[in-house]
């Protein structure tokens, strides 16, 4: 989302939404990008004009120095467009506010995870980590083995079903779709004054987005320019010429 051209993003929305409409009869209104290394401030405008109403991400919590102060907020783009945004806050519960398990060097008290395992500690941790408790009483926890495949396991589903019946000391669990969650979040955002983040969503942890494999990225950009020029001149030729 940092390097991709605006036209490419528009086409991805166009064909992605077309696929869901034709194959599933659904109009997709959520941009779900858990594992992306930062977001251009142009994205809210593109989302809004492509019929996207909500945005979810996770990895932005990996920032090395500056913690983004919101988890549920309006993201404002360079033209003033605002998109309702939610960061997944799932992580294990901590008694001392420090983090916690996994053993990964980037793991801190800020780090969250979209590959949830839906056990009581993670449910408690998701609520503990959430920063807009005074405005919203619901958080989103996605579970299953992602970032390589596998999805939800039978024991994860069984654990989720048991937690839904209630577990002492654990926030109430409800199994539902992301669409249902965001509909409720939109209702809450209309009733409460959600905070606003204006501009780029910058990820500090992976800083080589623009510079690593620079020749590949330069070639990709040349290809994007060439495709746009080809389409433009092809359209003009079809409109005014005998082609």
Task: Indicate where each model-derived feature is located.
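Catalytic-domain carbohydrate-binding cleft regions of carbohydrate-active enzymes
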Residues: 1-243
């Amino acid at each position: 989302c940092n390097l991709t051209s605006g036209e490419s993003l528009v086409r991805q929305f166009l064909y992605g939404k077309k696929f869901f409409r034709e194959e599933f009869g659904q109009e997709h209104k959520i941009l779900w990008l858990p594992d992306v290394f930062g977001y251009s401030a142009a994205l809210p405008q593109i989302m809004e004009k492509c019929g996207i109403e909500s945005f979810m991400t996770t990895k932005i919590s990996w920032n090395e120095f500056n913690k983004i102060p919101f988890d549920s907020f309006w993201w404002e783009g360079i033209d003033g467009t605002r998109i309702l945004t939610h960061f997944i806050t799932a992580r294990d519960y901590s008694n001392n506010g420090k983090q916690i398990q996994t053993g990964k060097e980037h793991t801190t008290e800020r780090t969250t995870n979209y590959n949830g395992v839906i056990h009581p500690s993670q449910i408690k941790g998701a609520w503990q980590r959430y920063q807009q408790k005074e405005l919203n009483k619901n958080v989103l926890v996605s579970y299953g083995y992602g970032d390589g495949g596998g999805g939800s396991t039978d024991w994860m589903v069984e654990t989720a079903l048991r937690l839904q019946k209630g577990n002492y000391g654990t926030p109430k669990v409800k199994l539902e779709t992301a669409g249902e969650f965001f509909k409720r979040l939109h209702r809450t955002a209309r009733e409460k004054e959600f905070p606003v983040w204006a501009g780029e969503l910058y990820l500090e942890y992976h800083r080589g987005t623009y510079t690593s494999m620079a020749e590949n990225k330069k070639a990709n950009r040349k290809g994007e320019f060439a495709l746009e020029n080809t389409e433009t001149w092809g359209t003009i030729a079809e409109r005014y010429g005998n082609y």
